[in-house]
A protein has these predicted regions:
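Active-site mouth loops of central-metabolism enzymes
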Residues: 19-33
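Generic structural signal for hydrophobic
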Residues: 41-42, 64
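Short, charged, surface-exposed secondary-structure boundary motifs
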Residues: 82-88
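Long, charge-rich, low-complexity intrinsically disordered regions
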Residues: 8-9, 14-17, 27, 62
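N-terminal basic/disordered segments at the start of proteins
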Residues: 1-9
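Hydrophobic faces of well-ordered beta-strands that scaffold small-molecule active sites
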Residues: 1, 25-27, 51-52, 74-76
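Alpha-helix-loop-beta-strand connector modules within alpha/beta enzyme cores
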Residues: 58-82
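Amphipathic, hydrophobic secondary-structure cores in small proteins
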Residues: 36-39, 45-56
Length: 95
């Protein structure tokens, strides 16, 4: 899972949750560029499914999907206008 939020440090905003069924990697990023880099890193390490938070707008989802095409499936939680970001799209804030 990758979330995007202002002032997020992608080196320290990380967690791993292990269950008997799956391992959930959580990475926070401050913009789409870091989101793409995190997704590529995850896919290269063998992660097969990446879910993006609602902060990723349509353009951000497309950027990540293109970057990991053929290596990982990409899904997304969706808000057209995110309530946590003053009802703006991530496409307005994080490119």
């Amino acid at each position: 899972f990758i979330f995007v939020a202002p002032e997020t440090d992608s080196k320290t905003s990380r967690a791993v949750i292990e269950t008997p069924v799956l391992i959930l990697n959580v990475i926070g990023v401050k913009n789409y560029e870091e989101g793409v880099a995190a997704a590529v890193q995850m896919a290269d390490s063998g992660v097969k499914a990446i879910e993006l938070c609602a902060g990723f707008g349509n353009e951000g989802i497309a950027m990540v999907s293109k970057a990991v095409k053929g290596k990982a499936c990409v899904g997304a939680v969706r808000f057209d206008h995110h309530p946590g970001f003053d009802f703006k799209s991530g496409d307005e804030l994080f490119q």
